[in-house]
């Protein structure tokens, strides 16, 4: 049996190649009603553009029906229909290939090249938590999620700034944001000397306030970059301060001195330079103008400033019924935490917030609610927060609480099987190679595999894409994809779990189907846990 991981991308690529030269034609089906009869479709209109009268030659139909290749899913049939060319896979064979190698489908499809480095800069973390606005909190969560996605993809990531405020460190721990703490401050002596050289003729001998070195003209540099670069045309001059130079010194230090254990390809190289590194500044739209100044100042004062600097701009955060600026990030966390505690008290009775066993669970649920709210919208778009209690309900299908609830349901299922096995009701789990995957024929089972497990490696890879070659200053990322994926996976699992009884009666003739269903849900659990790890969320065993 072939052992290479099957892939949606590989299958689509082979299907399109089989039709000959031209653009992509095939699409993957996702809706339940379509998946009842087909898995891929070449729409009739697309075929008309490729072939006379939309008729696919017989030899191509034969080639599609016999399609093979690395990572290509085995084909059962391919036939013309009114909608176009419909193709269905050998589902039992696909189930077997995928569920016999579950761990392989919880890793990115295409790891990054060895030695790729990204420096993520989140200026909001230089403030104290009580001054952290909701729009700044969004940048912190986006940067943390992006760092996790890049590292899972094999990219070497360095995070700046190192946090100095102990209260900020505590708050980040509450949010389950993995960010480094500061050990010592980088020296800005060299930068200060360069700045004074540039400023000598600009200050006209005037006395300056403490901490201010003078003004530096940036207009010429903006014009050199050109309008297409994306810099604000109103950028004229920059007030150079000791604090600003300290920020640049830390960035420069981080860029030039990477930890030796940060990536195997960089081992032993303490001064790796700036050439192969991408710097991404993750800032709110309110901070963009100031960050552009810092970017240009870095280029002005340092000969070997990074050539590849990109700005990831996060849109504003609006709170329904109230100005978002009135609520700080810690207040937002406390608000959600209080809601979670109240909801659990109503469900279970008593004041569980005082129970140490529930303290961690409430913290995870609060953070899950916040992260799914903040990260389910594309970071470049404006975000609207609804503070109603429905946002933390396990009944609502869009919330982080709903995802964590289904994570706990999976844990309960496998714990129930384990307990029943220890009691002698069920046998031990047999080798996967002995399972009969033809027993998986419920449409909900194929939906879970085809829409969630099989495409998950490609999703992980797309989450970590940084298009550093695109022209202009700004960069876009798809950090919303993981949250949306986990919500849809939870909805599909919940629908299946509510309808299908997994742990049946302890009768030998029912064990085969039970075990193959458990193996499918093992894969669902693996994918779900991996997705939650990309958000810094641990799986819960109960809620």
Curated annotation (Swiss-Prot):
Listed SUPFAM superfamilies: Anticodon-binding domain of a subclass of class I aminoacyl-tRNA synthetases
Molecular functions per Gene Ontology: arginine-tRNA ligase activity; ATP binding; tRNA binding
A Pfam family recorded for this sequence: DALR_1
Gene3D superfamilies named in the record: Isoleucyl-tRNA Synthetase, Domain 1
GO biological process: arginyl-tRNA aminoacylation; tRNA C3-cytosine methylation
InterPro entries hit by this protein: DALR_anticod-bd (IPR008909), DALRD3 (IPR037380), tRNAsynth_Ia_anticodon-bd (IPR009080)
Highest taxon listed in the record's lineage: Eukaryota
Keywords of this entry: Disease variant, Epilepsy
Disease tied to this protein: Developmental and epileptic encephalopathy 86: A form of epileptic encephalopathy, a heterogeneous group of severe early-onset epilepsies characterized by refractory seizures, neurodevelopmental impairment, and poor prognosis. Development is normal prior to seizure onset, after which cognitive and motor delays become apparent. DEE86 inheritance is autosomal recessive.
Assembly mode: Part of a complex containing tRNA(Arg), METTL2A or METTL2B. Interacts with tRNA(Arg)(CCU) and tRNA(Arg)(UCU). Interacts with METTL2A and METTL2B.
Function according to Swiss-Prot or TrEMBL: Involved in tRNA methylation. Facilitates the recognition and targeting of tRNA(Arg)(CCU) and tRNA(Arg)(UCU) substrates for N(3)-methylcytidine modification by METTL2A and METTL2B.
Name of the protein in question: DALR anticodon-binding domain-containing protein 3
């Amino acid at each position: 049996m072939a052992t290479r991981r099957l892939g949606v991308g590989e299958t689509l690529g082979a299907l399109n190649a089989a039709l000959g030269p031209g653009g992509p034609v095939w699409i993957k089906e996702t809706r339940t009603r379509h998946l009842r009869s087909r898995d891929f479709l070449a729409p009739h209109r697309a075929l008309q553009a490729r072939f006379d009268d939309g008729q696919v030659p017989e030899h191509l139909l034969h080639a599609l029906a016999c399609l093979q290749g690395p990572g290509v899913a085995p084909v059962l049939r391919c036939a013309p229909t009114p909608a176009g060319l419909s193709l269905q896979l050998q589902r039992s064979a696909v189930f077997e290939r995928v569920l016999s190698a579950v761990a392989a489908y919880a890793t990115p499809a295409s790891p990054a090249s060895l030695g790729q480095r990204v420096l993520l800069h989140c200026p909001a973390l230089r403030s104290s938590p009580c001054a952290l606005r909701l729009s700044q909190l969004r940048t912190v969560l986006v940067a943390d999620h992006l760092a996790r996605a890049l590292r899972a993809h094999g990219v070497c990531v360095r995070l700046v700034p190192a946090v100095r405020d102990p209260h900020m460190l505590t708050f980040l721990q509450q949010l389950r944001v993995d960010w480094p703490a500061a050990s010592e401050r980088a020296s800005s002596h060299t930068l200060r000397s360069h700045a004074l050289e540039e400023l000598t003729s600009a200050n006209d001998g005037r006395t300056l306030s403490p901490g201010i070195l003078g003004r530096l003209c940036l207009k010429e540099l903006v014009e050199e970059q050109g309008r297409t670069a994306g810099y604000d045309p109103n950028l004229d001059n920059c007030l150079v301060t000791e604090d600003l130079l300290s920020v640049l010194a830390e960035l420069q230090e981080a860029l030039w001195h990477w930890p030796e254990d940060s990536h195997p390809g960089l081992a032993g190289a303490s001064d790796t330079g700036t050439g192969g590194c991408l710097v991404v500044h993750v800032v709110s739209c309110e901070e963009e103008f100031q960050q552009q100044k810092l970017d240009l100042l870095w280029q002005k004062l340092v000969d070997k400033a990074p050539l590849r600097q990109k700005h990831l701009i996060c849109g504003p955060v609006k709170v329904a019924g109230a100005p978002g600026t009135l609520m700080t990030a810690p207040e937002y966390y406390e608000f959600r935490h209080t809601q979670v505690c109240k909801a659990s008290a109503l469900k279970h009775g008593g004041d569980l917030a005082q129970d140490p066993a529930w303290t961690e669970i409430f913290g995870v649920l609060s953070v899950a609610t916040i992260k799914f709210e903040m990260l389910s919208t594309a970071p470049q778009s404006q975000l609207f927060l609804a503070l109603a209690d429905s946002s933390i309900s396990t009944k609502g299908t869009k919330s982080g609480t709903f995802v964590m609830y289904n994570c706990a349901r999976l844990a309960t299922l496998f714990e129930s099987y384990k307990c029943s096995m220890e009691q002698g009701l069920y046998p031990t789990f047999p080798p996967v190679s002995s399972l009969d995957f033809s027993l998986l024929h419920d449409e909900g089972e194929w939906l879970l595999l085809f829409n969630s497990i099989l495409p998950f490696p490609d999703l992980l890879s797309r989450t970590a894409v940084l298009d550093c070659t695109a022209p202009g200053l700004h960069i876009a990322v798809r950090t919303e994809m993981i949250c949306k994926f986990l919500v849809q996976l939870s909805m599909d699992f919940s629908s299946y779990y509510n309808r299908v009884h997994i742990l049946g009666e302890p009768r030998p003739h029912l064990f085969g189907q039970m075990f193959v269903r458990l193996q499918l849900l093992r894969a669902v659990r693996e994918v779900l846990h991996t997705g939650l790890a990309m958000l810094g969320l641990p799986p819960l065993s109960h809620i």
